Amino acid sequence: MRASILPLTLFLATLAGAQLSGPVGPLVDYSTKARNQTCNIIDYGAVADGKTDISQALLDAWGNCSVGGLVYIPPGNYSLAEDIELKHGQSSAIQLDGVVMRGHRGSYQMILIRDCNDFEFFSGNSRGAIQGFGYEYLQNDTYGERLLRIQEVNNFSVHGFALIDSPSYYIVFDTVTSGEVYNILIRGVTSVGATDAIDVWGENMWFHDIEVSNGDECVTVKSPAHNYLIENIYCNLSGGTAIGSLGTGTNISDIHYRNLYMNQADACFLKSNNGDGIVKNIIWENVIVHGGPYPLAIDEAWGDDRGSVGVQVSNLTFRNWHGESVSASRPVIRLQCDSDVPCYDITIENVNLWANDSNYVVWQCENAYGDGACLSSAEGTKDLETFTSKQTITATPSYAAPTMAADFTFNLPSTSPFTIPPMPTSFYPGATPISTLLHLHGAGGLPSASPISHHRRHQ
């Protein structure tokens, strides 16, 4: 959100993100791009009947407006019958005010946006959506294409629309820099794995005000990743906010999670198995948990053995956590670090986690050094001994863990299409979204006669 029309707000927002390394978001605001050049897909042959393929219309509109302009998808239902790639954009935007629906069976992703700088993908009326009809695959234990991939894109934002019922993953942010992702709703089948909502690797990223209901991870950090602020995240029946899985060459640092609300989801699951590299300088604070299976977990024996020396994990802080796991049969705090490279400099502060079905909980630490819970203290960071510590806690902690009115208490269906719900107005108890939803009328919010519209001639 770095557009020139809001310099003071953006400056203050940047200061608020202590883990960010610099400004994020597009360099030029969407209204300026729309005023410069607008390409309405209707003028390129698109029909809002939910049946006619818009792939060529969208490609042609992008071809004319990918440098300095705005592609406009007006209200209505549109069928996308081919996977498309929109690439080489410079100071451009896509305004999604309608619903783009999967109209084919692809294998990669419906929309790939690649190699762009100063880019914005947003809904001007906060009613835009990408509809994947994923249940058609998932009910048969098969998978289809991802909905959206943002690849090698710098100085950008994605905001204000819904991604519904993906046949696979929802959004992948691949090798991205200085981006802001916010006011996003992701909803689909909640009983099937390999349906990650947001996977991201890159530099200097701000994610905020996002709600996810799916069958796998919610907002997941992959390697390499540096300088992220992830806040006001509502995982509403989901795997939760994870790091990993991590292989060889891992390089993750300076990630700040805050204001996480987990309904039947895990707030921290860091996972690897004999990879290598580093994970350091990570903060999780202000976390509310209602019913996750592993609410606070490091598992360095997870998944396939990568055959290396282990990922070095250090300087992690868990602060102000409240709530309960789904069952006392699993530890509410489980820090299982690699015996060859123990974790160190871990702080657990004011973490109050209980269990729904019990009068006790378990803390379990393996090869994890620091302060709090079952951690072992250490004077230095070299030659750390291996150990296992398991503690049973019977004193019920005193805490307040409010709930959200929209919490799901049942799995969402896998045999019927999803309706597109309105955009949420809250993503964490008591917190107002950082950016208000847009309510624009027309391309860029400009009067209909203002933009220079480029039309394709039909013969």
From Swiss-Prot:
Its main location: secreted. InterPro entries: Glyco_hydro_28, Pectin_lyas_fold, Pectin_lyase_fold/virulence. It is found in: Secreted. GO terms for molecular function: polygalacturonase activity; rhamnogalacturonan alpha-L-rhamnopyranosyl-(1->4)-alpha-D-galactopyranosyluronide lyase activity. Its EC number is 3.2.1.-. Keywords: Carbohydrate metabolism, Cell wall biogenesis/degradation, Disulfide bond, Glycoprotein, Glycosidase, Hydrolase, Polysaccharide degradation, Secreted, Signal. Pfam families: Glyco_hydro_28. GO terms for cellular component: extracellular region. Transmembrane segments: none annotated. GO terms for biological process: cell wall organization; polysaccharide catabolic process. SUPFAM superfamilies: Pectin lyase-like. Glycans are attached at residues 36, 64, 77, 140, 155, 236, 251, 315, 356. The active site is at 216 (proton donor), 290. Disulfide bonds join 39-65, 218-235, 337-343, 365-374. Residues 1-18 form the signal peptide. Pectinolytic enzymes consist of four classes of enzymes: pectine lyase, polygalacturonase, pectin methylesterase and rhamnogalacturonase. Hydrolyzes alpha-D-galacturonopyranosyl-(1,2)-alpha-L-rhamnopyranosyl linkages in the backbone of the hairy regions of pectins. PANTHER family: PECTIN LYASE SUPERFAMILY PROTEIN-RELATED, PTHR31736. Belongs to the glycosyl hydrolase 28 family. This is Probable rhamnogalacturonase C. It comes from Aspergillus niger (strain ATCC MYA-4892 / CBS 513.88 / FGSC A1513). The gene is rhgC.
